[in-house]
């Protein structure tokens, strides 16, 4: 059995195996990988797509998802994260799926349990299953990631999605470019190219990953205005009309009119709904990888 704490823990062989299994689950919707297994889904942050897709994935693999609601737990009475983990550990669950605002919280959990731990997002650090579903969505369209030019746009500084995607897509041979307001870009990412605005590089790109503005993690005043952000870094109908080959992704939830205009959703090369569907099957494949 394996844990999935970050992208670094996955080999190229692991990634392609997960993609292949995801293809299988697109056709075969269920199996018994998790039969008689209780999987604790412990989300200390809010979520729709990730939490629900993991719950459905566990059920389709024959397991029982146990939902932990942080807002209704003893955390609201002052219990610490570690004490909560120690308490939950006593129930001998067979695996954990955890999301937490603290970076490395899944790694801390792993020191307390021998069961597989899957990181469903930890602070601004990692979100490996989001990166896997993003890469798979592109892979399913192209058949390969190798040699593709991919631009990541927006609040890179606060984005665990950006960090995981950069690491995964580079492993698969993509050339990664990043752009966003200077206040929202980290000082450096190894082997990436920074460009001034979305318009400076879009003509060379095969795909663009638009990032959500992480308002819950960022200080006020990091961008002059939402209107200016949309002008220099937003995806809009004019760009899609000019570059019809361009594939567009967004991890959701989107701030429409800022990161991407609502009109973009009508275009077949805007793959936001594909990402949501692929997210279920990727997470089934990840559970298979961790428990098989």
What are these language model-derived features?
Residues 266-292:
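C-terminal helix-to-coil terminal segments
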